[in-house]
């Protein structure tokens, strides 16, 4: 045999919302700290992304919600993402979603772990578009785009339950 034998350890790489990894990138500049995610980071199994910041929004920033439809409607131009003050931030959300998709593709990610309830990252729930703190079933813009392209998307709760076997 002329070819050397190489053994490769294969690790699952995850795309994770940066705010879940302790980065203060949420709209209110807060972050979450999950030890399980920190452990994955120490093992270099994580690509971090904040779609809203990738789309050019500042931190802190005004809260935003999907108005007039679903995340899929936002992606097709039939709904908007607006701040509570009435600023249209739809394009920033779309740009951030596509930049996040590009990262996932470049790094051959299979699973994205995104922040539930976010207008970008929500997997199962988002806020209802009336700034009333009421949640409704739905996905955020980035989550919808990743799902559309065949990526597994889960919320932090689903992911942490999977890691701990609950």
Task: Report the location of each language-model feature.
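Short acidic/polar active-site loop segments enriched in Thr and Asp
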Residues: 110
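Active-site loop/lid in soluble adenylation, ligation, and acyl-transfer enzymes
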Residues: 17-30
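Divalent-metal-activated hydrolytic enzyme cores
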Residues: 24-27, 35, 54, 72-99, ...
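Extreme N-terminal starter segment of soluble prokaryotic enzymes
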Residues: 11-15
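Short hydrophobic targeting helices and cationic amphipathic motifs
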Residues: 2-7
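Short, surface-exposed acidic-centric catalytic microdomains
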Residues: 32-82
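Short, well-ordered beta-to-alpha junction loops that form the rim of enzyme active sites
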Residues: 115-118
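Short Gly/Thr/Asp-enriched flexible loops that form oxyanion-binding sites at enzyme active sites
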Residues: 121-141
């Amino acid at each position: 045999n002329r070819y050397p034998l190489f053994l490769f350890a294969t690790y699952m790489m995850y795309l994770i919302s940066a705010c879940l990894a302790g980065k203060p990138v949420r709209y209110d500049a807060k972050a979450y700290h999950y030890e399980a995610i920190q452990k994955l980071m120490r093992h270099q199994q994580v690509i971090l992304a904040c779609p809203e910041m990738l789309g050019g929004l500042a931190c802190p920033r005004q809260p935003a919600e999907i108005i007039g439809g679903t995340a899929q409607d936002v992606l097709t131009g039939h709904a908007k993402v607006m701040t509570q003050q009435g600023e249209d931030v739809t394009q920033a959300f779309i740009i951030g979603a596509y930049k996040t998709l590009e990262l996932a593709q470049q790094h051959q990610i299979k699973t994205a772990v995104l922040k539930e309830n976010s207008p970008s990252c929500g997997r199962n729930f988002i806020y209802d578009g009336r700034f009333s703190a009421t949640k409704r079933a739905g996905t955020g813009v980035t989550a919808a785009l990743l799902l559309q392209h065949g990526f597994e998307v889960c919320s932090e709760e689903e992911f942490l339950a999977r890691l701990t076997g609950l």
